[in-house]
Swiss-Prot record:
Signal peptide: none annotated. This is Ubiquinone/menaquinone biosynthesis C-methyltransferase UbiE. The gene is ubiE. The keyword Acyltransferase does not apply. It is an enzyme of class 2 (transferase). Keywords: Menaquinone biosynthesis, Methyltransferase, S-adenosyl-L-methionine, Transferase, Ubiquinone biosynthesis. InterPro entries: SAM-dependent_MTases_sf, UbiE/COQ5_MeTrFase, UbiE/COQ5_MeTrFase_CS. Methyltransferase required for the conversion of demethylmenaquinol (DMKH2) to menaquinol (MKH2) and the conversion of 2-polyprenyl-6-methoxy-1,4-benzoquinol (DDMQH2) to 2-polyprenyl-3-methyl-6-methoxy-1,4-benzoquinol (DMQH2). It comes from Shewanella sp. (strain ANA-3).
Length: 251
């Protein structure tokens, strides 16, 4: 690449300059933040709650631990972690998007979840935390929106304590042909219509469907985590692989 030439990446199916993607993604989430929780329930028929519950169950969170809920959005995981780590623990809800952080902060405070939760606007590619700081890091439905996923995984590895665990909950690739066909029909025909009706924004949900298709599949993401320094990496498919939970450890 010659000096001054821009590096390109994907924004959904579009090819864009890498340094423009973060702003484009920000526009999506500024647009949908206020109705984000409603859309999650509607578009997943509530199943996202079970995916997140399983993530919490396998996290091993205990009283006194420090947890980073990265791309934590409106705080579903943070709320659960806050209870598990207790008053001697700490949960950091970090998100690059200030609109999502505001919605999350308001929701959790309205539910009385205060004291052991802090809120940080942060880019996953360059996390503003000390080395070896967190016992657990989760990133749920956020990694596919990151411009440089490899840099983000390395950054997560840096701030994770030795013995700590990374959990990546993300849309992935259905395992059976019939499910793939049904999922494609739903994603590209039904989902944007839902977005248009509920949020007045079909384009953001077209991006959602496209970004899922451009995200690395299960085995590719597993290798990316290994390359970033994580060990004993494995994953569990849920709902036939529409979603996968990847786990990796730092030793």
């Amino acid at each position: 690449m010659s000096e001054g030439e821009s590096k390109n990446t994907h924004f959904g199916y579009k090819t864009v300059e890498a340094d423009k993607k973060a702003d484009l993604v920000a526009g999506v989430f500024h647009s949908v933040a206020a109705k984000y929780d409603i859309m999650n329930d509607v578009m997943s028929f509530g199943i996202h709650r079970f995916w997140k519950r399983y993530t919490i169950e396998v996290s091993g969170a205990r009283p006194g631990m420090k947890v980073l809920d990265l791309a934590g959005g409106t705080g579903d995981l943070t709320a659960k972690f806050s209870h598990l780590v207790g008053e001697k623990g700490e949960v950091v809800l970090a998100d690059i998007n200030d609109s999502m952080l505001k919605v999350g902060r308001t929701k959790l405070r309205d539910r009385g979840i205060v004291g052991n939760v802090s809120y940080v606007q942060a880019n996953a590619e360059a996390l503003p935390f000390p080395d070896n700081h967190f016992d657990i890091i989760t990133i749920a439905f956020g990694l596919r929106n990151v411009t440089d996923k490899d840099a983000a995984l390395r950054s997560m590895n840096r701030v994770l304590k030795p013995g700590g665990k990374l959990l990546v909950l993300e849309f992935s690739k259905p395992q059976h042909e019939l499910m793939r066909k049904v999922y494609d029909l739903y994603s590209f025909k039904v989902l944007p219509k839902m977005g248009e009706i509920i949020t007045k924004d079909a384009d953001s949900y077209e991006y959602l469907a496209e970004s899922i298709r451009m995200h690395p599949d299960q085995e590719t993401l597993k290798q990316m985590m290994v390359d970033a320094g994580f060990e004993q990496v494995d994953y569990t498919n849920m709902t036939d692989g529409i979603v996968a939970l990847h786990r990796g450890y730092k030793f």
